[in-house]
Amino acid sequence: SFSPNPINLIEDAHRVRPTSGLEFVSSRHFPDEVQGDILVHNTIGFLGTKQHSMTDGGTGYASSFRQDLLKGNDGNFRPVDMEFAPDGSLYLVDWHNVLVGHMQHSARDPLRDHVHGRIYRITYPSRPLVKPAPIVGASLTQLFENLKLPEYRTRYRTRRELRGLSTEEVLPALTRWVNGLDANASGYEHHLVGAMWGGW
């Protein structure tokens, strides 16, 4: 059977070319109303970061352009990656290169810069930074509790730490932690998913 093309989530006026930088807002350092927004970099044409709200849309999602979070006026500005830090601030990587791609320029072009770039830190001054959760060297109990935190990147880093520990140590403790969760508490299913991924 024929499957129709998926609905494009981004409005025509704000579409960007394929990009290597994409992040969902998941930080208590930023306002509540932007949690879950998607941030998308672009390095050709529009040089910057667009922000779109994301909402449930039936069996998928719907989005709406919120703002140009960042726009460069330097023709070499190449935002290529971003990630929320343990303190909730947003770090952005700018490749800052005169050349883009390898179709129109040789990979050996002397103008291709392999060593320079820029890193920006974006904060929301009227809100406090997030207290970083202990991860490296933290107890299993602390790591499991981190899985309840609202910051996706903290949960991600916690899962990576758990995966580096012995299965024989983690799984029995994780099972005890899951069995101790309150099935009627808010976020219960979310915590179960975190435990599943943390024990993988």
Task: List each language-model region with its residue ranges.
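Beta-propeller domains with acidic blade repeats across secreted/periplasmic ectodomains
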Residues: 1-145, 153-157, 161-165
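Buried hydrophobic core positions in alpha-solenoid tandem helical repeats
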Residues: 142-144, 173-178
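Alpha-solenoid helical repeat architecture
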Residues: 146-151, 178-187
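Residue-level detector of extended alpha-helical repeat arrays and alpha-solenoid scaffolds
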Residues: 154-155, 188-192
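Hydrophobic core/packing positions within alpha-helical solenoid repeats
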Residues: 162, 192, 196-199
